A protein has these predicted regions:
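Eukaryotic low-complexity, mixed-charge intrinsically disordered interaction/regulatory segments enriched
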Residues: 294, 298-317
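Terminal, low-structured helical/coil segments at or just beyond the last alpha-helical repeat
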Residues: 278, 315-363
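C-terminal substrate/ligand-recognition segments
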Residues: 289-294, 330
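Alpha-helical adaptor scaffolds
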Residues: 108-116, 140, 144-151, 174-181, ...
Length: 363
């Protein structure tokens, strides 16, 4: 899942080889080389090498572990559908754990399967704790644990694990972004803003921190700042036409109109992209929720529920769904996912800036 780094355990196991087959060993190393580049194209190359390593040595646990990580990353990022990703991820992780019960990465990936694909929170925590016991210095493992904890509304613990991932891999912006997101989901907007602002300075080419600031400002009444950050984020994403049009709509019609314009344009982009490949249903659901089109939002959320889309982990956390929280269908989804119903992601007194009802009509 997400960024992949070589840990102490992995260095030891690579040096140990775990196979007497020189060809399998070299193929595995090539797979790790491409996996660490962390782009979809390179990850696809890594899969080919891991599969070739397994062909050369069917009992090579490390190669199965690498293959499981590939499917986890591609499924989590939406490069391939959950239907394709999760069974393959689980099968590879189970085989790795069978071949080497003390391979920490195998337990981490089994935890990720339980978390993302099965919504089995108890098993996920059991497996992630076992992984940390075997290798306490893997940033990816602490990130995965933080994801589980934030899903459970255990925000203090989630932040502890997120910051541990940062300590272990301080150069990765991914862990810093995750820490900011935990603050945001906990409605700790000041802390989230500080984190995102730091990222705009340390990693200026990333769109995510600007979009994170947009989300914060749009919910705290800082309209001009929100538009500016959204424009920057869209530009970095390559949506130049939308980015250029946004300030004009804001100047002529105000913030609500500009925000609605951006959401509708995003829906057009998503619809076009879905004709070419897989797009997560959550992407549609969040935009329709922002438009206050509840029926369409729940239609896409039901599809996401059926697929076990990764974004469903944020269902009871994401402020984008605040328009839906009073609807019985929302609480029913939370119940069916076995999420903690006694907790509420919405803190009393938080002012939210949403669309006016008369602007919420959809085509």
């Amino acid at each position: 899942m997400l960024r992949l780094k070589i840990t102490n355990e992995q260095r030891q196991r690579i040096s140990k080889k775990y196979t007497d087959n020189a060809e399998a060993y070299q193929l595995y190393l090539k797979g790790r080389h491409y996996q660490l580049k962390d782009t979809p194209e390179d990850l696809r190359k890594s899969r080919q090498y891991f599969e070739q390593a397994i062909d050369a040595d069917p009992n090579y646990a490390l190669a199965y572990g690498g293959l499981s990580e590939y499917y986890g990353f591609m499924g989590y990022s939406g490069e391939i559908s959950p239907k394709e990703a999760w069974p393959a991820m689980e099968a590879a992780a189970l085989r790795a754990a069978q071949l080497d019960p003390e391979l920490a990465a195998a337990h981490r990936e089994l935890a990720a399967v339980s978390l993302i694909a099965k919504w089995d929170w108890v098993t996920a925590e059991k497996e992630i704790k076992r992984s940390i016991e075997l290798d306490p210095n893997d940033a990816e493992t602490h990130f995965t644990y933080s994801m589980l904890l934030r899903t459970m509304h255990r925000f203090d613990e989630a932040l502890r694990e997120a910051k541990r991932a940062e300590e272990l891999d301080p150069l990765s912006p991914g862990w810093k972004s995750h820490t900011a997101l935990v603050h945001y989901y906990a409605r700790q907007f000041d802390a989230a803003e500080e984190r995102y602002r730091q990222l705009t300075h340390s990693d200026p080419d990333l769109p995510g921190p600007h979009l994170g600031l947009y989300n914060i400002y749009s919910r705290t009444g800082k309209e001009s700042e929100a538009v500016a950050e959204l424009q920057k984020g869209l530009t970095l994403q390559g949506a130049d036409e939308l980015a250029a049009a946004l300030p004009r709509v804001y100047a002529s019609s105000g913030f609500h109109a500009a925000r609605e314009f951006a959401v509708r344009e995003q829906l057009k982009i998503l619809t076009d992209a879905s004709r070419q490949g897989y797009i997560s249903p959550v992407a549609f659901a969040t935009n329709y929720a922002l438009l206050n089109d509840k029926d369409k939002a729940f239609k896409w959320l039901e599809k996401a529920f059926e697929e076990h889309t990764p974004g469903m982990l944020d269902l009871d956390l994401d402020p984008d769904y605040d328009n839906l929280r009073s609807d019985p269908r929302f609480r029913d989804l939370v119940r069916r996912m076995n999420l903690p119903q006694e907790a509420s992601a919405v803190s009393p007194g938080v002012q939210l800036v949403e669309f006016e009802p008369d602007r919420a009509k959809t085509d």
